[in-house]
């Protein structure tokens, strides 16, 4: 081991010895660190040392990896908890920013000063007083349990003291104590334990009685320990004595109680509310009596004044917090009005954001979507989704119009009238939801309206205006078309079987080959007679038919049969069983006054009269029921006058009660019928013509004159068709992915189709078009032609609108582009007119303009670009010097005619600010410049 052993440890060394590595492995010489070891044992020791160092390094790395994994798990858990919806973000407590502002770590504020103590003695308002929170059911349960435990503890306190004494005697007994005493003490202790256990096991109803003494309850301990300081002693004690005490009556107020309360309060002998509660004799507190009288008894329905409306609007603005109005505070500031009254008045009348009047189709669509999302329960969220409508409007619209069941009928029979009056007797007036349980085919709104109609009918009968049958019929609306058709079907099914069989036998005798049953025969005959019945109903709706009907009624009145007499007697009995109170009469009178006031204060009355005065009278007698017609030869002013006068006449006629009733019963169904017929004609009949034209064009016998599609074969764009077009555009990407299983996109060539994989199919969006090739058997079929024609009729105009309408992003790009072009044009115009002075060149006094550059290019010019290229690329200077050594290349080109593109490019280059050349000792060597444009035109200018 006399030779020198070299060991290369890497970075850690003890002695630096320069050596040369193998020449075959390294191309250059390197100096490395080495260890000098004279013996093999020394080399092994060094090796073991490095092994230990490596092991410790591996352990350290492993420990760091474990720590990293643990930290990753912690971060994942924190991220999961952060994204959980049920864990709310921690917020700063609000009480930190509320008085008192000077608090220590325990939220304790300094003692009161002399001024504060004086204000407290004088009963001044305490600004530190907090508003009482509403009691929750859990807090009420805690209070009852605490009071019960306090009463039980006070009751068993003497027994517990005696128990402790007897127990101490038993513990202290010794040999001097007789067995008799021990036995007596043991029996007494067991008796005390039984009494204590019995009292402690009593229920709340047995302990919390009206005769219990609640003065022994430690209210301070309950407020501090049981409620942990969240309620004050005064709040806990007041809650128990004024509300939760069992001696107070908490049942619903009966009618006798309300009447007696009203009498005692309005009596001149009224002194105070405690005396009134004592005289009432129903175990009501003074606060209960005052609250009942202020909120319900004295709150009769009175008109809102202008001052009240102004005050209510101001209060809603003051008490509004983040869009939510505190109606309790508003009601407190409005004496004589309840919370529901002020809320209803503001939301239904005074709220400027709430829209009134007829519902549009767009609002109905929003309402249906909101109900499908939130359900027909949370009407506040539904109203927020619909916008400009309150919750009651949304509920009424959904319940009475959009979601009205097909079996709900507006008309009431005599049996249903009896059921309604019985339900009112059972449940009382106003409980229409409960009354609906007895009449499931009627809505609560229909029951209320029918009850008011019965009251009005009895008043008319008592006044002698009509008989009982006419009084019962008044107020009912005219039946709709679908209801009349349903009645025809029911009446047809109720035809006696004998008559049906007789007609069938006569018809079968004349036609022996008849294979129909009597039921099938009669159904076929009834189906043929239904259009005639509809025409007869339409005839009855005409005004001329009323005269004939009146004459027939006179004849029928003279010869009235017994059934009608019984019906009139039955109607009289129903009206006689109806009890009308003074409140009902007062309500009907106020309701009529309200309707009259609304009629006189209608919105368009003044405007219509003013417009009618400004319009020049025309010589045409207009009928509100007829549409205005024009003569093509009339002037445009005359046509405008006709339109304005017809609109004014329609509004005036609509204000008339008789014509308005006729409109709501008959004419309002005309427009939907016309629209339905128009759509059916366009989608079905016109589509057939388009389908025939499509098949004719695809056939071989098509001429050049047959290429044009039939005119007026598309529907006008509507909200429904436009929404359908939007829905199809949204679903286009999914449809493209479905069709990609069988077809390829148009931008995929035949050679690329082999490499078109599933990933590319899944990435298809709605902007790419598919190359869908259908067979001639499909495209030439009538079904495909009809489908094409109907889709064309519905979606052609919405597609044109979608193409013609510019998107917001495209509009922004276009405006930016136009502004840039205008700015560039203005700048070029100013430069041309020498309104903008370019930066002066360092070597001469010449100003560069597009005109001067064009003149120099036509005559030849000198441009030195050496320094310019050197500034743009540092390597270019080296290349230029290398080229100079080889030789200078010059190209003598005389430019006489330049294309317009080159001139524009040169003008753009000239418009840029010139760079000053670098200072050099000698004259720069001439070179060449290349100007590359977008059209790849290279321009080389000779430099003299």
Swiss-Prot record:
Domain HTH myb-type, first and last residues per copy: 245-301, 351-406, 407-459
Role of this protein: Binds to the promoter regions of RNA polymerase II and III small-nuclear RNA genes, type 3 RNA polymerase III non-coding RNA genes, small nucleolar RNAs and transfer RNA genes. Required for expression of mature 21U-RNAs.
Key word Repeat present: yes
InterPro entries: Homeodomain-like_sf, Myb-like_DNA-bd, Myb_dom, SANT/Myb
Gene3D superfamilies with a match to the protein in the record: Homeodomain-like
Disulfide topology: none
Region (Disordered): 1-22, 911-935
Superkingdom: Eukaryota
Name of the protein in question: snRNA-activating protein complex subunit 4 homolog
UniProt DNA-binding region: 273-297, 379-402, 432-455
Phenotype upon gene inactivation: RNAi-mediated knockdown from larval stage L1 results in decreased 21U-RNA expression and disrupted distribution of prde-1 foci within the nuclei of germ cells.
Gene Ontology CC terms, in alphabetical order: nucleus; snRNA-activating protein complex
Domain annotation Myb-like: ranges: 177-244, 304-350
The entry's keywords: DNA-binding, Nucleus, Repeat, Transcription, Transcription regulation
Pfam families attached to this UniProt entry: Myb_DNA-bind_6 (PF13921), Myb_DNA-binding (PF00249)
Record has Ligase as a keyword: no
Tissues expressing this chain: Broadly expressed in all tissues, including head, vulva and tail.
Biased composition (Polar residues): 11-22, 922-935
Localization per record: Nucleus
Gene (name only): snpc-4
A molecular function (GO) term: RNA polymerase III type 3 promoter sequence-specific DNA binding
Compositionally biased spans, kind Low complexity: 911-921
BP GO annotations: protein folding; snRNA transcription by RNA polymerase II; snRNA transcription by RNA polymerase III
């Amino acid at each position: 081991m006399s030779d020198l052993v070299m060991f290369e440890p890497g970075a850690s060394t003890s002695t630096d010895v320069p050596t040369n590595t193998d020449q075959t492995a390294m191309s250059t010489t390197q100096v490395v660190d080495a260890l000098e070891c004279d013996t093999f044992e020394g080399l092994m020791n060094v090796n073991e040392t490095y092994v230990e160092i490596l092991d410790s390094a591996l352990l350290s790395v492993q420990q760091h990896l474990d720590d990293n994994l643990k930290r990753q798990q912690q971060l994942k858990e924190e991220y999961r908890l952060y994204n959980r919806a049920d864990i709310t973000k921690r917020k700063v407590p609000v009480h930190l920013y509320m008085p008192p502002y000077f608090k220590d770590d325990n939220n304790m504020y300094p003692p009161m000063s002399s001024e504060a103590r004086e204000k407290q003695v004088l009963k001044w308002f305490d600004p530190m007083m907090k508003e009482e929170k509403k009691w929750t059911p859990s807090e009420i349960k805690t209070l009852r349990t605490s009071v019960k435990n306090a009463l039980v503890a006070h009751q068993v306190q003497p027994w517990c003291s005696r128990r402790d004494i007897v127990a101490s005697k038993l513990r202290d007994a010794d040999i001097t104590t007789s067995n008799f005493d021990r036995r007596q003490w043991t029996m007494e202790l067991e008796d005390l334990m039984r009494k204590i256990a019995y009292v402690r096991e009593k229920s709340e109803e047995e302990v919390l009685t009206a005769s219990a003494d609640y003065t022994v309850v430690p209210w301070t301990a309950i407020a501090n320990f049981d409620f942990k300081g969240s309620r004050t002693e005064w709040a806990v004690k007041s809650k128990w004595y004024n509300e939760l005490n069992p001696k107070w009556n908490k049942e619903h107020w009966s009618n006798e109680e309300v009447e007696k309360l009203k009498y005692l309060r309005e009596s001149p002998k009224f002194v105070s509310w405690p005396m009134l509660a004592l005289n009432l004799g129903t175990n009501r507190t003074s606060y209960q009596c005052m609250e009942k009288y202020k909120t319900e008894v004295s709150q009769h329905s009175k008109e809102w004044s202008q001052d009240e409306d102004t005050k209510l609007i101001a209060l809603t603005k003051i008490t509004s917090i983040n869009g939510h109005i505190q109606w309790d505070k508003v009601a407190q500031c409005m004496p004589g009005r309840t919370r529901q009254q002020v809320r209803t008045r503001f939301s239904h009348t005074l709220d400027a954001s709430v829209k009134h009047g007829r519902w549009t189709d767009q609002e109905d669509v929003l309402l249906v979507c909101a109900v499908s999302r939130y359900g027909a329960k949370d009407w506040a969220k539904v109203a927020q989704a619909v916008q400009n409508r309150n919750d009651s409007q949304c509920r009424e619209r959904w319940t009475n119009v959009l979601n009205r069941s097909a079996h709900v009928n507006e008309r009431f029979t005599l049996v249903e009238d009896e059921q309604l009056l019985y339900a009112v007797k059972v449940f009382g007036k106003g409980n229409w939801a409960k009354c609906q349980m007895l009449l499931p085919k009627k809505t609560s709104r229909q029951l209320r309206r029918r009850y008011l109609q019965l009251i009005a009918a009895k008043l008319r009968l008592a006044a002698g205006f009509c008989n009982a049958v006419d009084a019962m019929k008044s107020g009912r609306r005219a039946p709709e078309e679908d209801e009349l058709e349903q009645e025809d079907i029911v009446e047809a099914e109720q035809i006696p079987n004998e008559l049906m069989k007789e007609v069938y036998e006569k018809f079968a005798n004349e036609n022996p080959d008849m294979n129909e049953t009597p039921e099938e025969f009669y159904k076929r005959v009834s189906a043929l007679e239904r259009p005639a019945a509809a025409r007869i109903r339409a005839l009855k709706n005409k005004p001329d038919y009323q005269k004939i009907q009146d004459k027939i009624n006179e004849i029928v009145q003279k010869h009235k049969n017994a059934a009608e007499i019984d019906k009139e007697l039955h109607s009289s009995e129903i009206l006689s069983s109806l009890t009308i109170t003074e409140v009902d009469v007062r309500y009907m009178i106020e309701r009529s006054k309200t309707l009259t006031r609304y009629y006189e204060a209608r919105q368009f009355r003044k405007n219509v009269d003013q417009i009618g005065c400004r319009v020049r009278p025309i010589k045409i007698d207009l009928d509100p029921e007829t549409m205005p017609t024009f003569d093509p030869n009339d002037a445009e002013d005359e046509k405008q006058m006709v339109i304005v006068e017809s609109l004014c006449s329609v509004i005036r006629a609509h204000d008339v009660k008789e014509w308005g009733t006729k409109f709501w019963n008959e004419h309002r169904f005309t427009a939907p019928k016309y629209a339905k017929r128009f759509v059916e004609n366009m989608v079905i009949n016109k589509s057939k013509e388009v389908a025939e034209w499509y098949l004719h064009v695809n056939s071989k016998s098509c001429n050049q004159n047959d290429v044009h599609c039939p005119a007026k074969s598309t529907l006008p764009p509507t909200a429904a068709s436009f929404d359908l077009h939007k829905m199809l555009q949204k679903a286009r990407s999914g449809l493209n992915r479905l069709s990609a299983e069988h077809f390829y996109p148009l931008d995929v060539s035949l050679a690329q189709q082999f490499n078109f994989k599933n990933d590319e199919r899944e990435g298809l969006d709605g902007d790419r078009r598919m190359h869908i090739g259908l067979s001639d058997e499909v495209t030439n079929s009538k079904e495909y032609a009809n489908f094409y024609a109907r889709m064309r009729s519905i979606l052609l105009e919405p597609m044109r609108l979608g193409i013609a309408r510019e998107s917001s992003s495209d509009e922004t790009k276009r405006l930016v582009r136009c502004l840039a072009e205008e700015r560039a044009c203005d700048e070029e115009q100013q430069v041309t007119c020498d309104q903008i002075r370019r930066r002066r060149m360092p070597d001469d006094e010449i100003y560069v303009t597009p005109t001067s550059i064009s003149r120099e290019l036509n005559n030849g010019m000198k441009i030195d670009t050496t320094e310019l290229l050197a500034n743009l690329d540092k390597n270019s200077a080296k290349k230029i010097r290398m080229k100079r050594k080889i030789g200078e290349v010059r190209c003598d080109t005389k430019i006489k005619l330049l294309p317009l593109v080159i001139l524009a490019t040169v003008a753009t280059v000239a418009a840029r600010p010139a760079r000053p050349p670098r200072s050099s000792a000698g004259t720069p060597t001439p070179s060449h410049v290349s100007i590359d444009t977008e059209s790849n035109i290279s321009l080389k200018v000779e430099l003299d």
